């Protein structure tokens, strides 16, 4: 069932971009090669973005040039294995290897310390984001229209079943960094119960007040509530800049490393 679900879950579009000299090429631990782009505004925080399903880097780069300007952040976005100009075929472990390769490049090559990295996962991108935040220290995490787990979407179950993919609802309890969740009340793909379950399973003090977008769907939160969407995002980043880094997060940084 696992391989069948994998084929259903991952829906890479036909590549919308070609090889470009401005792309960064990363080698992953799964022996694949994936592209990424970096928008550098010399800002305090860098968003490490994990995109949604059925899209690739070519579909989001113009949008993130705007986001970088609005939020005054750097943005590092990477491609998934099997998507766009990447090699290989998409599967859960490959996606985890992709975000780990992206984080290592940010930290070791570009020189962005973990204290300035904010994970930003949208839809299926919540999976690799929660995986990384549970595994190593980052400054914060933003989840937009996240999923509790794949089987909770596909089978409408409230329990974690053997072979489940991206079990965010079980894993998020290991996350120590501040976590901000945004979801729409009319999300037709991932109902808001997914976000509610994630908030409920966060450790005490980890969940920043979530933003629930009235009448927001799965792919239109920035359209339905453009100004409040960015205002709330900015407020979170401003709060983050003033907030002391939690001691348990500092300890995690000392004890774990990719």
Residue positions per predicted region:
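Short alpha-helix in the alpha/beta-hydrolase fold that links the catalytic acid
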Residues: 63, 168, 177, 191-201, ...
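Short beta-strand/loop motif that positions the catalytic acidic residue
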Residues: 174-176, 180-183, 187
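Alpha/beta-hydrolase active-site loop
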Residues: 89-111, 170
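C-terminal catalytic histidine-bearing segment of alpha/beta-hydrolase fold enzymes
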Residues: 196-200, 204-258
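An N-terminal hydrophobic leader/cap segment in hydrolases
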Residues: 1-28, 33
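The serine-hydrolase catalytic nucleophile loop
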Residues: 52-69, 87-89, 193
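Conserved alpha/beta-hydrolase
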Residues: 68-87
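Acidic catalytic loop of the alpha/beta-hydrolase fold
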Residues: 185-190, 218-220
């Amino acid at each position: 069932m696992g391989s069948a679900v994998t084929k259903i879950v991952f829906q890479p579009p036909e590549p919308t971009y070609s090889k470009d000299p401005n792309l960064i090429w990363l080698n992953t631990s799964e022996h694949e090669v994936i592209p990424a782009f970096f928008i550098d505004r010399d800002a305090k925080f860098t968003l490490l973005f994990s995109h949604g399903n059925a899209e690739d880097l070519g579909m989001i780069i113009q949008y993130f040039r705007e986001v970088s300007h609005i939020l005054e952040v750097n943005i590092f976005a990477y491609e998934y294995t099997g998507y766009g100009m990447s090699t290989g075929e998409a599967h859960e472990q490959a996606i985890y290897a992709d975000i780990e390769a992206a984080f290592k490049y940010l930290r070791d090559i570009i020189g962005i310390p973990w204290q300035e990295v904010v994970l930003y996962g949208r839809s299926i991108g919540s999976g690799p984001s929660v995986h990384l935040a549970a595994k190593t220290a980052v400054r914060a995490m933003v989840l937009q229209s996240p999923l509790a787990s794949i089987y909770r979407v596909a089978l409408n179950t409230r329990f974690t079943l053997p072979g489940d993919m991206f079990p965010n609802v079980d894993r998020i309890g290991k996350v120590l960094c501040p976590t901000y969740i945004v979801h729409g009340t009319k999300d037709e793909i991932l109902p808001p119960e997914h976000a509610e379950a994630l908030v409920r399973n966060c450790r005490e003090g980890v969940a920043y007040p979530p933003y629930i977008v009235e009448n927001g769907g799965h792919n239109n939160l920035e359209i339905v509530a453009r100004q409040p969407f960015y205002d709330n995002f900015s407020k979170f980043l401003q709060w983050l800049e003033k907030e002391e880094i939690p001691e348990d997060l500092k300890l995690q940084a000392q004890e774990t490393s990719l």
